[in-house]
Amino acid sequence: MLGSKKKYIVNGNSGIKAQIQFADQKQEFNKRPTKIGRRSLSRSISQSSTDSYSSAASYTDSSDDETSPRDKQQKNSKGSSDFCVKNIKQAEFGRREIEIAEQEMPALMALRKRAQGEKPLAGAKIVGCTHITAQTAVLMETLGALGAQCRWAACNIYSTLNEVAAALAESGFPVFAWKGESEDDFWWCIDRCVNVEGWQPNMILDDGGDLTHWIYKKYPNMFKKIKGIVEESVTGVHRLYQLSKAGKLCVPAMNVNDSVTKQKFDNLYCCRESILDGLKRTTDMMFGGKQVVVCGYGEVGKGCCAALKAMGSIVYVTEIDPICALQACMDGFRLVKLNEVIRQVDIVITCTGNKNVVTREHLDRMKNSCIVCNIGHSNTEIDVASLRTPELTWERVRSQVDHVIWPDGKRIVLLAEGRLLNLSCSTVPTFVLSITATTQALALIELYNAPEGRYKQDVYLLPKKMDEYVASLHLPTFDAHLTELTDEQAKYLGLNKNGPFKPNYYRY
């Protein structure tokens, strides 16, 4: 599949160009003291997506050692200090985590085995900004096996598993990330990945668009050598489309978020399992009979609603799109406006990708002990900033769980400060992440090896053939056997026997 230099051709006209405008406002970050005299790197940066995506299962919490990693002098066993992690001594534990993840990521391991002899990414210098977990480590090491040099930072302040970052640093990957970064730390880590003497990236792998945004703001000349951008999240994709619409996108970009393998597997199945895991670990709540409102009925919302319904919850849905709204109704959920149920629900979950979905007015009207959380990428969906006022008291009851108390004694339970719930408070299924990570790897290979002129300065969707290939790599895990078309059947349908089997407009 990867042996030919001729790669997949993406239909440049198939991208979804609908724009969702986000206000250019700075997000709320975890407030942590930084060393006096440090120059803030973040003052000119807006619209950050440093939402929470950390694991409750992490070997160490960020509070274990209050000394900032930036103030430590650390070296790995090879003598390299080109990294900044919480504690390099955690590398052995992190290596075990990575080895466990490899067992549930069959497609990436198969891709590593099939393509490492060819080295399709030889000469690639990839700078990445994603969630640094064991699954990401498997992706990074696969990219390295395929010939790429990588430098990596975390795409949000809570996502990093410290032991995994240490294991990557011990293996020689320049990683700049730790759990519980401050705002200044976040941008400093990204800058350390990008601003390196004698090393300049030629590929970007982003999740949320912050890395791309930083390079545009601080080092625009770097785009002269960058061949392309691969973006995973809805937030980052919207930012790319906005750049393209304004005529400011100067390199080709691949939209992984809207690929079939991301939308229908990562967004749906991942959230269907991890929403319950995150809520259980943080609240110990029984879901049977509880009233829940889910804001948004996209693939993430569908997964959340299905999981909660199966547990016996009474689920309401809010939605702006009449098509998604009709789907919710026919799936057995009651469609409401948030104001209609806000006084009675026990749990509020946002998954829209928009801003101020839950406002201070909504928060004021919630019942006592209502649980409020977000499982969309951005941390803008819940107006957490409006809760940071003198009349309200914040009480940290456990990691990633805050009680916000009103003067009359009413309290709400806010999870992960309104940031991404599932890996802030739990984990996500490794097998599902294998699907997304394989898609990212193939997108990087495609853009890096594409002949000049194949891709213009625009945002492209993955080709159907690539989606089908990713899916096929995961089928052996289930001992699944695909039916093959006969020549007569293929001719009747007008298809190639080897695919693609669906047109680009097909909705799975």
Curated annotation (Swiss-Prot):
Residues 24-81 are annotated as: Disordered. Pfam families: AdoHcyase, AdoHcyase_NAD. SMART domains: AdoHcyase, AdoHcyase_NAD. The modification Phosphoserine is found at residues 4, 46, 49, 52, 55. Its cofactor is NAD(+). GO terms for molecular function: adenosylhomocysteinase activity. GO terms for cellular component: cytosol; endoplasmic reticulum. It comes from the Eukaryota. Binds 1 NAD(+) per subunit. Pathway: Amino-acid biosynthesis; L-homocysteine biosynthesis; L-homocysteine from S-adenosyl-L-homocysteine: step 1/1. It catalyses: S-adenosyl-L-homocysteine + H2O = L-homocysteine + adenosine. It is found in: Cytoplasm; Microsome. Substrate binds at residues 133, 207, 232, 262, 266. Keywords: Cytoplasm, Endoplasmic reticulum, Hydrolase, Microsome, NAD, One-carbon metabolism, Phosphoprotein. Residues 32-41 have a biased composition (Basic residues). NCBIfam families: ahcY (TIGR00936), PRK05476.2-3 (NF004005). Belongs to the adenosylhomocysteinase family. This is Putative adenosylhomocysteinase 3. It comes from Pongo abelii.
